[in-house]
């Protein structure tokens, strides 16, 4: 019998400001790996996290 997929999945969060400003001198995009519960949050996850390239707290969105 096949095993069911887990409810929690691994997702990647990416900085929204670094992605829009591709020509930064720091040269990078901040990414965080986290887990989310598919049942509780079916839509894409958005969290305020610290970006070391922007040197401030900014919105990070889930990417596929």
UniProtKB/Swiss-Prot annotation:
Pfam families: Ribosomal_L33. GO terms for molecular function: structural constituent of ribosome. Keywords: Cyanelle, Plastid, Ribonucleoprotein, Ribosomal protein. It comes from Cyanophora paradoxa. PROSITE patterns: RIBOSOMAL_L33. InterPro entries: Ribosomal_bL33, Ribosomal_bL33_CS, Ribosomal_bL33_sf, Ribosomal_zn-bd. One of its GO terms (cellular component) is ribonucleoprotein complex. It is found in: Plastid, Cyanelle. Belongs to the bacterial ribosomal protein bL33 family. HAMAP family: Ribosomal_bL33. One of its GO terms (biological process) is translation. This is Large ribosomal subunit protein bL33c.
